[in-house]
């Protein structure tokens, strides 16, 4: 059943969807890792593909930038297409000195400056957390693959350009491992609709050190993260 944002049939998607923010990255993942894949959505250029990874049916779909976009697509995938497991595979910023560019970080939970989870939780704080089984599994797989990962809490912000030094100091004080624009929203939707979700990101920007990867590097240099996510759902 198509929606205003996803022009696909009911069975076009796997029950497992990996979600990068960038549609170009979704296309890259499908072409590099999936066999017998087909494009199942191009509405609003939010590209989606379904194919097979080691005989497991997998879908890849971009979610765009920010909580509103990511929440919209995850909600429609869950309600209209029976998706049961979502892994965000994206980029994030870092503030801690021990976290470097290209490090892989996994979000146990995510606080946010958005009001989205307060809206759904009667204006109270909501603990937006990942699914435990997914965390346990991906950490186990990372050890087998000898891929270093760091685990901690994210801060999901509505503002990409923010030079608030006071806030940066707070993020460091509370040991925030990654700063992104989607995770808290995805975890909120997943919790409300009773499905599994996990956010795994590669550090593309170090906010306090003012280091960053180029747009070209962001497109295709995150293979370890992608392979880790794919292996974790077999």
From Swiss-Prot:
Site (Important for catalytic activity): 218
InterPro entries, sorted: DeoD-type, Nucleoside_phosphorylase_CS, Nucleoside_phosphorylase_d, Nucleoside_phosphorylase_sf
Documented EC number(s): 2.4.2.1
PROSITE patterns (UniProt xref): PNP_UDP_1
Catalytic function, reaction form: a purine D-ribonucleoside + phosphate = a purine nucleobase + alpha-D-ribose 1-phosphate; a purine 2'-deoxy-D-ribonucleoside + phosphate = a purine nucleobase + 2-deoxy-alpha-D-ribose 1-phosphate
One example GO MF annotation: purine-nucleoside phosphorylase activity
Residues that coordinate or bind a purine D-ribonucleoside: 5, 180-182, 204-205
Function: Catalyzes the reversible phosphorolytic breakdown of the N-glycosidic bond in the beta-(deoxy)ribonucleoside molecules, with the formation of the corresponding free purine bases and pentose-1-phosphate.
Record key words, sorted: Glycosyltransferase, Transferase
Subunit structure of this chain's protein: Homohexamer; trimer of homodimers.
Gene Ontology CC entries for this record: cytosol
Protein name: Purine nucleoside phosphorylase DeoD-type
GO biological process, one term: purine nucleoside catabolic process
Record-listed phosphate binding positions: 21, 25, 44, 88-91
Cysteines engaged in disulfide bonds, as pairs: none
Underlying gene: deoD
């Amino acid at each position: 059943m198509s929606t205003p944002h996803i022009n696909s049939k009911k069975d076009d998607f796997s029950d497992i969807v990996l979600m990068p923010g960038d549609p170009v990255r979704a296309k890259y993942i499908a072409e590099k890792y999936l066999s017998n894949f087909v494009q199942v959505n191009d509405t609003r250029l939010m590209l989606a593909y379904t194919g097979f990874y080691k005989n497991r049916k997998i879908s890849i779909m971009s979610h765009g930038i920010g909580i509103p976009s990511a929440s919209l697509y995850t909600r429609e995938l869950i309600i209209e297409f029976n998706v049961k497991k979502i892994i965000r595979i994206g980029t994030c910023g870092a503030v801690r000195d021990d976290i470097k560019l290209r490090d892989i970080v996994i979000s146990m939970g995510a606080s946010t400056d958005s009001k989205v989870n307060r809206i759904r939780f009667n204006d109270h704080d909501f603990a937006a957390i990942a699914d435990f089984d997914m965390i346990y599994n991906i950490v186990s797989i990372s050890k087998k693959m000898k891929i270093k990962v760091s685990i901690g809490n994210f801060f999901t912000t509505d503002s990409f350009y923010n030079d608030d030094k006071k806030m940066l100091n707070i993020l460091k004080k509370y040991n925030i491992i990654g700063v992104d624009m989607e995770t808290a929203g995805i975890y909120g939707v997943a919790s409300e609709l009773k499905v599994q979700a996990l956010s795994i990101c590669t550090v593309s920007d170090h906010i306090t050190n003012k280091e960053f990867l180029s747009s070209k590097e962001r497109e295709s240099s995150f293979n370890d993260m992608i392979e880790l996510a794919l292996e974790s759902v077999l």
